[in-house]
Regions:
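Sec/Tat signal peptide C-region and signal peptidase I cleavage site
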Residues: 16-20
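Subset of outer-membrane beta-barrel
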Residues: 21-430
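Hydrophobic alpha-helical membrane context
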Residues: 14-15, 80
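Sec-dependent N-terminal signal peptides
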Residues: 4-14
Length: 430
């Protein structure tokens, strides 16, 4: 009980820390985060991200898999598991002859999982959903006010607190259900400074507090082939539900002409997009895994293009749409049971991962999606006893593949702490 309370305290503290970040430093940075809820954060732990983000059909009793709630029953029956991930990204933006560089760092996930009863398990955690971070400025010449400086800034993000339960039936079929609470603060601001001081500075913006309650369901089925080889198929579905919370739209013209308009988001008809995911994997014992995942998320009825603070301000046409992703990845362990000493034998116990992905954004800009393509590498170094490990992942990718879009080339890294212990064994005394 003491250990359980300690783990829960760490989780709650981490959730508070994530929420606090929305008012300060950037959790993510991209000019495309000006649209909607911002740039969607890649789901999953460092274990998932090292394999290109797959996990819908993955079952592994050594790692927590937060992509499919049905997967949590793949575990040792007496085990307590925890995962905490940190991540950062270096991005280079280019448009014509202009270049810019930015770095970000954020907590990626905190999750704990433990068994409840025979063939059942429970999981609770917190993870980012979207990031808003941008600072865009440019100048033009106006016939009346001479030179004008336009600046648009935004920061914040949304996070998801989740709790899930799952059960396995007939040793092959696993079903899970997850409750999601999404929360966060987003601030967007635009400023126009006129070169002629007789014209007042104009400021407008929105402060958003976003909340959402939703559910996610998952299923996995394992089919043994031969020996230790197993094919697993999996699917997930996340519900589309209303966005609640409140917003304040403000406009300022100089020091005296100020107007603030508060409103409730539940009255705007805003909705989160639903998401359907399917995956298939091939696993051979604990040594080899390869998986392909496809996800589709429909935001076309979210109404974000009709509500201030979510829609853009300017000539660019933003429209919510259907997002998709294709992911392929896997992992390999040379010899997990090699107990010999020496650096070579240590690396034979390590797990090595790789993956590729292609993402299509959940919106269009001037009629075109903002697509991403990337590759990932990862490894887990065994630490101490049981299945404790330190997972490290690298990511190389590019966003804005069309010649008319701002190109973002990024290098990301993630570090995950995988904690495993036996908490629920009963001791016999003579």
């Amino acid at each position: 009980m003491r250990n359980s309370l300690l783990a829960l305290a760490v989780l709650v503290f981490s959730a508070g820390s994530l929420g606090a970040q929305t008012d300060g430093t950037y959790g993510g940075f991209s000019p495309y985060s000006v649209f909607g809820l911002g740039q969607m954060h890649q789901s999953g732990t460092s274990w998932n991200r090292g394999m290109g983000g797959v996990g819908i059909a993955a079952r592994n009793h050594r790692f927590i898999n937060i992509l499919n709630p049905a997967s949590m029953t793949a575990r040792d029956s007496l085990s307590f598991m925890a995962d905490m991930g940190l991540g950062g990204r270096i991005s280079v933006f280019s448009e014509g002859d202009k270049r810019a560089l930015n770095t970000t760092f954020n907590i990626d996930d905190v999750a704990i999982s433990f068994p409840m009863w025979r063939h059942t398990a429970f999981m609770v955690g917190v993870t980012p959903v979207s990031d808003v971070g941008y600072n865009i400025s440019y100048r033009d010449i106006d016939v009346y006010t001479q030179q004008r400086q336009f600046t648009s800034t935004g920061n914040g993000g949304t996070y998801q607190l989740f709790a899930a339960a799952a059960a396995t039936f007939w040793n092959r079929l696993s079903i899970g259900a997850q409750f999601n609470y999404t929360f966060g603060n987003i601030s967007k601001k635009s400023t126009i400074v006129n070169g002629d001081e007789s014209y007042r500075t104009m400021v407008s913006g929105d402060s958003l507090q976003v909340n959402n309650l939703s559910g996610k369901f998952g299923i996995q089925y394992e089919q043994p082939i031969s020996g230790q080889s197993v094919i697993t198929v999996g699917a997930t579905y996340k519900l589309s539900t209303p966005i609640i919370g409140h917003s304040v739209h403000y406009r300022e013209l100089g020091s005296y002409d100020r107007k603030r308009t508060p409103s409730e988001l539940k009255d705007k008809g805003l909705r989160m997009g639903d998401e359907l995911g399917i995956g298939i994997s091939f696993r051979r014992g604990d040594d080899f895994l390869v998986e392909f995942d496809y996800t589709r998320s429909d935001w076309s009825k979210s109404r974000m293009d009709q509500v201030s603070g979510f829609s853009n301000v300017g000539d660019v046409v933003f429209a919510p749409s259907v997002g998709q992703s294709f992911r392929l990845g896997g992992e390999f362990t040379p010899n997990r049971n090699d107990v010999r000493s020496g650096i070579l034998h240590f690396f034979r116990r390590c797990t090595f991962r790789g993956g590729v992905y292609y993402d299509q954004s959940y919106y269009t800009v001037d009629g075109a999606h903002v697509n991403s393509v990337g590759a990932t590498l990862g490894t887990t170094l065994p630490v101490f006893r049981w299945y404790n490990g330190l997972s490290v992942g690298l990511e190389f990718g590019s966003r804005g593949l069309s010649s008319s879009q701002v190109r973002e080339r990024y290098f990301g890294f993630s570090v995950g702490f995988n904690i495993f212990d036996i908490w629920f064994q009963k001791h016999a005394y003579q």
